[in-house]
Amino acid sequence: MKNRYIQQFEDAQLKDKVMPQFKAGDTLRLGITIKEGEKTRTQYFEGVCIAIRGNGVDKTFRVRKMGANNIGVEKIFPFYSESLASVEVLRVGRVRRAKLYYLRDRRGKAARIKEIRH
């Protein structure tokens, strides 16, 4: 059970940031703000959301993409991170699992996720 004051502080933090609705299996395009000395720039990371865990301020999601030479790259992002400039849902995937860790073992066409057509 959290302290009442901690809960009020966390609720105030959550009000500021609005995130789009997405789930595991969706393809996301994340804009990450990177500060290098005096300059700031936005770097984009595009991949499949393979897991969402936690709740409240501690909620995180894991995104996986295939990098150069077919090397898988996974990054974990806090939902309410200040470094996330933008989150865009590119495709809505059709999966039956909440955690898609089995995609780590798949290669090529076997690693694809079916898209929900509207």
UniProtKB/Swiss-Prot annotation:
Example GO BP: translation
Protein name: Large ribosomal subunit protein bL19
InterPro entries documented for this protein: Ribosomal_bL19, Ribosomal_bL19_CS, Ribosomal_bL19_sf, Translation_prot_SH3-like_sf
Taxonomy, superkingdom: Bacteria
Organism: Helicobacter acinonychis (strain Sheeba)
GO cellular component labels: cytosolic large ribosomal subunit
Keywords of the record: Ribonucleoprotein, Ribosomal protein
Annotated family: Belongs to the bacterial ribosomal protein bL19 family.
Reported function: This protein is located at the 30S-50S ribosomal subunit interface and may play a role in the structure and function of the aminoacyl-tRNA binding site.
Cystine residue pairs: none
Taxonomic classification: Bacteria, Pseudomonadati, Campylobacterota, Epsilonproteobacteria, Campylobacterales
GO molecular function: structural constituent of ribosome
HAMAP family, per database record: Ribosomal_bL19
NCBIfam families per the UniProt record, alphabetical: rplS_bact
